Each structure stands twice: as structure tokens, then as C-alpha cells.
Design a protein with these regions (language model features):
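A compositional/biophysical signature of low hydrophobicity enriched in polar/charged and small residues
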Residues: 1-84
Length: 84
């Protein structure tokens, strides 16, 4: 919802993956508890992911320790939402 802010730390990731592996990567992403959603994209990136976590540290560990280490991921762009 517009204007409504979750109290959990959130991040949005754009993921580039090896050709033809987007379904496999999405399947693996959905196994990670912090992944709120993962959708295929058309054009500049392959997948968009929303992450929610209990803490910023847990969010960082999920991004660096789990998602970026998945097979077939070539690159990521991550933005983390901050409180005002």
C-alpha cells in the first residue's frame, strides 16, 4: 500500500542470472524465509525480489550469505529502505 511502511527492514533486489535459469533461481529464492516475493522481469534484469527481515544484520546476511551465493546468479543490484 502506498504510504504504509512495514516496521521490518526491507530490501529490493534486481538479479541478473544465466540465460534460461530464471525459473530455477526463483525456485531457490522462494526457499529463503526472508524472500517476500520473487518475480520474473522482461528487459534489463531477470528477477525482482523483495526481502523482509527482523534486523538489518539478518538482511545483510541473507543477501550476501545466501542469495548472492546461489548458482546461476551473475549480478545483483540491491536497495535497502530506511526509516525517515
Amino acid at each position: 500500500m502506498i504510504g504504509r511502511r512495514s516496521t521490518l527492514p526491507i530490501a529490493i533486489m534486481l538479479i541478473d542470472c544465466s540465460i534460461g535459469t530464471d525459473d530455477v533461481v526463483i525456485h531457490e529464492l522462494k526457499k529463503i524465509p526472508a524472500v517476500a516475493y520473487a518475480y520474473k522481469l522482461i528487459r534489463y534484469h531477470d528477477i525482482i525480489v523483495k526481502l523482509e527481515s527482523n534486523s538489518e544484520e539478518e538482511l545483510r546476511k541473507t543477501i550476501s550469505g545466501k542469495i548472492r551465493k546461489l548458482d546461476n546468479i551473475l549480478g545483483t543490484i540491491t536497495v535497502v529502505a530506511l526509516e525517515k
